[in-house]
Curated annotation (Swiss-Prot):
The keyword Repeat does not apply. The record marks 115 as: Essential for interaction with UBE2M. It is found in: Nucleus; Cytoplasm. One of its GO terms (biological process) is regulation of protein ubiquitination. Changing residue 241 to A: Loss of interaction with CUL1, CUL2, CUL3, CULA4, CULA5 CAND1 and RBX1. Does not affect both nucleus and cytoplasm localization. Reduces cullin neddylation. Loss of interaction with CUL1, CUL2, CUL3, CULA4 and CULA4. It comes from Homo sapiens (Human). Residues 8-45 form the UBA-like domain. Changing residue 16 to A: Loss of ubiquitin binding. Changing residue 235 to R: Loss of interaction with CUL1, CUL2, CUL3, CULA4, CULA5 CAND1 and RBX1. Does not affect both nucleus and cytoplasm localization. Reduces cullin neddylation. Loss of interaction with CUL1, CUL2, CUL3, CULA4 and CULA4. The DCUN1 domain, also known as PONY domain, mediates the interaction with different cullins. The DCUN1 domain mediates the interaction with the N-terminally acetylated NEDD8-conjugating E2s enzyme leading to the NEDD8 transfer from N-terminally acetylated NEDD8-conjugating E2s enzyme to different cullin C-terminal domain-RBX complexes; the neddylation efficiency correlates with the DCUN1D1-cullin and DCUN1D1-E2 interaction affinities. The UBA-like domain mediates interaction with autoubiquitylated ARIH2 leading to ubiquitin ligation to DCUN1D1. This is DCN1-like protein 1. Part of an E3 ubiquitin ligase complex for neddylation. Promotes neddylation of cullin components of E3 cullin-RING ubiquitin ligase complexes. Acts by binding to cullin-RBX1 complexes in the cytoplasm and promoting their nuclear translocation, enhancing recruitment of E2-NEDD8 (UBE2M-NEDD8) thioester to the complex, and optimizing the orientation of proteins in the complex to allow efficient transfer of NEDD8 from the E2 to the cullin substrates. Involved in the release of inhibitory effets of CAND1 on cullin-RING ligase E3 complex assembly and activity.
Amino acid sequence: MNKLKSSQKDKVRQFMIFTQSSEKTAVSCLSQNDWKLDVATDNFFQNPELYIRESVKGSLDRKKLEQLYNRYKDPQDENKIGIDGIQQFCDDLALDPASISVLIIAWKFRAATQCEFSKQEFMDGMTELGCDSIEKLKAQIPKMEQELKEPGRFKDFYQFTFNFAKNPGQKGLDLEMAIAYWNLVLNGRFKFLDLWNKFLLEHHKRSIPKDTWNLLLDFSTMIADDMSNYDEEGAWPVLIDDFVEFARPQIAGTKSTTV
């Protein structure tokens, strides 16, 4: 780091804080991305395995990882971890299976469906994270949570959640399941989340299509406190149009009572 300019050193420090990565990884990633901090950070979160030093994977004990998998594998099907194994996995991590941390791990494992991991998902996911023990995985969780502060990575996580949560073979996501996952992933991110849930339970009562799920994130990031910037002529799903129509009088009523 001594050979770097002061501006580059600042970027290395910022990169390390934001990504929770090592100095070597920071220098490697920034130098490959013309020292553009935003580009380097974005690329790191999209493909961390390209930048994290091979020593992380080199120090991985494959036998130890295999033994860890065997602790959780389904007794009836050795190629997957079933619901009991997932519960044990969460207990070992001291995590609630319904917590966002477990969902983030599933995202990093690229899990296809909830309540199970295939052997490949578990082994590849742990290898990519450089983990061969529960202790190492625990230490990675704050870094994964930090990763979601980058909007592009959160969007990827959010869109993953739809496919993960729905029943295989179904196009839409059951309403109750959609609301449960929205409460998990959009809590603190969508100012109208409670009102949205109320609207769905009172007026929709049907499954949620993928495009509505995906576009709700865009809606949540752009909508003003009074919804005055909503464009009815925009390419929004009908459900979001109907929600705005439902919500505006309630928002106006709330404001008038607080004045």
